[in-house]
Design a protein with these regions (language model features):
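Short, surface-exposed polybasic-aromatic patches that bind anionic ligands, especially phosphate groups
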Residues: 1-3, 205-207, 229
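Short nucleic-acid-contacting surface segments enriched for D/E, G, S/T with interspersed K/R
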Residues: 212-228
Length: 237
């Protein structure tokens, strides 16, 4: 049994098969689309979500997701069955471009951009916590090479997709991400009984963030969380 980092971030330490077994009997609606694919979303009282489904080619997936209070206008389209490309258009300007695993894939078309409302979130995979923006900046200054501010979201797979060096099936939503904590709360995932951090933070835009419980003893407003994150989203067409 191996734990997927996105599931671990929301308090699920079992593997994919065990997680799906836990969903049996939860009466999660499953949506079938005409192309032969299907998908469903379990929403936990804690705000944690588990998206699962089967693509047109029969490939199955199980991904973590997260409820977020922050919604933004965007242009979005799918690059594979459940991986989507988004341009955030807050205030009419592009505020960010990123890839995200979506929990409701049929809200987007494949390759053709749609105007949608998106609720992005970030799930911590390899995370460093800094006590303040000053501490984060100091740590950045001690490293040679690329330095990023405390509110960034960089999807490395974007360049490969746009250049044609990678396909949507090869890409992922893993990103370099940092945010300043606005609030943080230890919540219990009722599906498993395990805790995780539910964080509201300001990155390129404010969004919800999930971190494994062991990430920090005390996350506080003004702290900076940075590292490798899995970006996810819910779409309102």
């Amino acid at each position: 049994m191996s734990t997927e980092p996105d599931l671990h971030a929301i308090g699920i330490d079992e593997g994919v098969a065990e997680t799906r077994e836990r969903l049996v009997g939860r009466n999660v609606p499953v949506i079938d689309d005409p192309a032969g694919a299907s998908w469903g979303v379990y929403t936990d009282p804690s705000g944690a979500k588990v998206a699962f489904g089967r693509a047109e080619d029969g490939t199955e997936y199980t991904d973590a997701n997260l409820e977020s209070p922050h919604a933004y206008p965007a242009q979005g389209y799918r690059v594979s069955y459940n991986l989507a490309h988004f341009d955030l258009l807050e205030g009419g300007d592009r505020e960010g471009r990123f890839l995200a695993y979506v929990d409701n894939p049929t809200a987007l078309t494949l390759t053709e951009p749609n105007k949608v409302t998106v609720r992005p979130a970030a799930l911590g995979a390899e995370v460093v916590v800094y006590a303040s923006e000053d501490e984060y900046k100091q740590a950045q200054s001690e490293h040679d090479g690329l330095t990023l501010d405390a509110k960034h979201l960089k999807s490395p797979w974007l360049l490969a997709l746009h250049s044609g060096d990678a396909t949507g099936d090869e890409a992922s939503s893993v990103a370099m991400f940092a945010a300043v904590v606005q609030s943080a709360q230890l919540r219990t995932n009722e599906l498993t009984g395990r805790e995780f951090w539910y964080v509201l933070g300001e990155s390129v835009v404010p969004m919800a963030i999930a971190l494994p419980a062991e990430t920090a003893q005390n996350l506080h407003p003004g702290a900076v969380i940075a590292g490798a994150f899995i970006i996810v989203a819910s779409v309102e067409a």
